[in-house]
Swiss-Prot record:
Belongs to the glutamine synthetase family. Residues 40-69 are annotated as: Disordered. It is found in: Cytoplasm. This is Glutamine synthetase. Pfam families: Gln-synt_C, Gln-synt_N. Residues 23-102 form the GS beta-grasp domain. Signal peptide: none annotated. Homooctamer.
Amino acid sequence: MVSITEQTAILAKYLDLSQNGKVLAEYVWIDADGNSRSKCKTLDKKPSSVEDLPEWNFDGSSTGQAPGHDSDVYLRPVAFYADPFRKGDNIIVLTECWNNDGTPNKFNHRHESAKLMKAHADEEVWFGLEQEYTLFDQFDQPYAWPKGGFPAPQGPYYCGVGTGKVYARDLIEAHYRACLHAGVDISGINAEVMPSQWEFQVGPCEGIQMGDELWIARYLLQRVAEEFGVKVSFHPKPLKGEWNGAGCHTNVSTKSMRLPGGMKSIEVALSKLAKRHKEHMLLYGADNDQRLTGRHETASIEGFSSGVANRGASVRIPRSVAKEGYGYFEDRRPASNIDPYLVTGIMVETICGSIPDADMFKEYARESSD
């Protein structure tokens, strides 16, 4: 049997072949389970803008996005990035899913979120997302954990250095470079509290770009992990017991929050978030109740709380922000498996105001509609 490393080496010589002027465009979309899917299309030339990219389609009955008797779902390009795998002029295309009647597919939450971002563009809302995830081997065991046993308790792994303290750094470094090559605004990485758990940060990004960049960063992570024979889990509590869960802490600021005296705007935003806690929690990721227990650096899912430098609160205000009197806040409630369009959308809706033609709670509920 050929090893994964050998397969990659074999592939390399074919990637050096001429494409005779053609460009490969990998179309990426989000399926019914919140996973990324993709397929490739040949273009005659490199596009200069997203408007140059053709609409495409796929079999939605095979992804849980359409019934078999009416299975065509259409892919509308919304952004494209340099392809770090094929390199050259090849690209990765992020798309929205649309039904054949011209309506957004019920798992396309970008469309609704974009309405809110556009309506509140003057607020200049910035986001930064901290994506945590856990690595597993091909047999669904935590990557590099002792066979049939457990590693030492949590403590030495967070931002750890050295054998036995960090695992799969090569994969993480490869993903970091892939994001930078693609043009994703990745701002950092670190090993997390549980062994074989990592985090990358994307942002700050303004408006709808935040969701776009996180989805592409996730896609790139899954693709890189393929080459290492490693599985990536975004489950918020992949292992029961005395192990940290995985979140997607959401850092938020508006223009007024970033100006001197902005703490007043932050306090107003927190009071609005407190009033919609239950609604937000429904959009903050499946199985999040397993993570938000009030332990392992989380708040309880049952109520809203906030505090300065408090990682056991629903929302944390960094100490530097409290000292300077302006900046941003960190919503620690979102789970690692969120749809960032839902989370950033309801955040803007809550702190900036609702608009007549967009409702993120109803948008989320569309997933359960017939």
